[in-house]
């Protein structure tokens, strides 16, 4: 019996503050997988280093060898970047794939790649979007079959069931192109939305029920809401 089945924990280094480093120091023994938020991608497909410096993470990488350390590549929710990569505009996707290989070569100790591409388009683009993730997955596995690939996915309660316009994402189609998937089920309302509940129970249950029906449940990390917003009618939170 696998006593850890269903009890894995994934976190990311998005915050980059003192509290984050304290948590890594004190609680790293409880973490299974970490996305290193140290890479961003441009609309040209170029990947550049930004965010938490890899050099600042080496102490924790060496201290906790049981953790899968993944290089996270993000587009910061820029639709123009997502679209250029998806459509291979001026060879953007081709360059992106070669850049993924480059950063794995630069940091050979990494356990794999974490893809955080957000703010895609509607359902009419789901085939092309899935093809992009297929190409990323095949690129990672062609480089080294042992490298792990995690993908970050928006909260969905059905096909075409995004509250944030992310209907390009079809869980069942993407299941084959990841080793794990982090479902962002922690933000029905967020800093860029209208005021509302962060993650109402009905929405969370809808995501969990749908995701476990169409994806391999053993692959999934489900995001847990542990925050709130100070909504203000005269300013952003």
How should these model regions be labeled?
Residues 9-13, 32-36, 69-73, 113-115, ...:
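Hydrophobic faces of well-ordered beta-strands that scaffold small-molecule active sites
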Residues 6, 29-31, 66-68, 110, ...:
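A general structural motif
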Residues 43-52, 119-237:
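Substrate-binding surface in catalytic domains of secreted glycosidases
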Residues 65-66, 90-91, 105-110, 140-146:
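Intrinsically disordered, low-complexity coil segments
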Residues 1-104:
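Glycan-recognition patch characteristic of GH18 chitinases/ENGases
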Residues 59-60, 99-106, 139, 209-214:
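A generic secondary-structure signal
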Residues 27-35, 88-117, 166-189:
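Structural recognition of alpha->loop->beta junctions
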Residues 77-82, 113, 190-192:
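Short acidic/His/Gly/Ser-rich catalytic and metal-binding motifs that mark active-site loops
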